[in-house]
């Protein structure tokens, strides 16, 4: 054994050896298969630069991109019974909740943020699909109501970002009870004369579309979002017919009058700020992009 064996060879092996790389450095575009560097994706608000595909986004990132300078404060999540039905499927519901809380750092699927957009104070309520598919249970329902109550208290508009698979089956009727409760909260906000804008993101399905997600003064959808009560596969199996191309997509729903506009995530802040300033009779920002004029066909329609 000599110094080449003892020193040089290990050095060469360490330099040329296989290094462990984080698994999430590159993210695959579901629409094209293109690999995108994670920092490029994050700097573009998790919108694929080449294809415009909108990736799912966590609640805290959504709030950071939405509010001025990324500054906001969150409301403490309301405390609710964790597992009143003692439900169990493949594992105990209480254990499933603990697992999601550990993975996401969230108490439940809803985060309420207070901040400003273009200087206008608002309340933003964000549903996070990464927490049990954004499902609506007691915790999420209470947090939504908390957001509406805070908006009424502070006399601020409320912007809600919906992203959910529907009611949380592990909570049974206690989950379904959140549909009328959140609907009442919407009515309270409207009675207070405060604007309510809903942003429908991918996916927005199930019971949320039968309650607060479709009760806004204005409905904006992100491009390519799946929006509907039941999924297209379930509908096809039920009616035994092939659905139209793009059925339940944002663009399809706008063409058929179910949403008011489809707006890229990159333009959401400016668009919502302009709408809220009009609705609250404040001077609009001249730097914000102006709405497109309707073409001849839409005028005729």
From Swiss-Prot:
One of its GO terms (molecular function) is ATP binding. It catalyses: N(6)-carboxybiotinyl-L-lysyl-[protein] + acetyl-CoA = N(6)-biotinyl-L-lysyl-[protein] + malonyl-CoA. PROSITE patterns: COA_CT_NTER. Its EC number is 2.1.3.15. InterPro entries: AcCoA_carboxyl_beta, Acetyl_CoA_COase_Trfase_b_su, ClpP/crotonase-like_dom_sf, COA_CT_N. Pathway: Lipid metabolism; malonyl-CoA biosynthesis; malonyl-CoA from acetyl-CoA: step 1/1. Keywords: ATP-binding, Cytoplasm, Fatty acid biosynthesis, Fatty acid metabolism, Lipid biosynthesis, Lipid metabolism, Nucleotide-binding, Transferase. Its main location: cytoplasm. It comes from the Bacteria. Residues 25-294 form the CoA carboxyltransferase N-terminal domain. It is found in: Cytoplasm. Acetyl-CoA carboxylase is a heterohexamer composed of biotin carboxyl carrier protein (AccB), biotin carboxylase (AccC) and two subunits each of ACCase subunit alpha (AccA) and ACCase subunit beta (AccD). Component of the acetyl coenzyme A carboxylase (ACC) complex. Biotin carboxylase (BC) catalyzes the carboxylation of biotin on its carrier protein (BCCP) and then the CO(2) group is transferred by the transcarboxylase to acetyl-CoA to form malonyl-CoA. This is Acetyl-coenzyme A carboxylase carboxyl transferase subunit beta. It comes from Brucella canis (strain ATCC 23365 / NCTC 10854 / RM-666). The gene is accD.
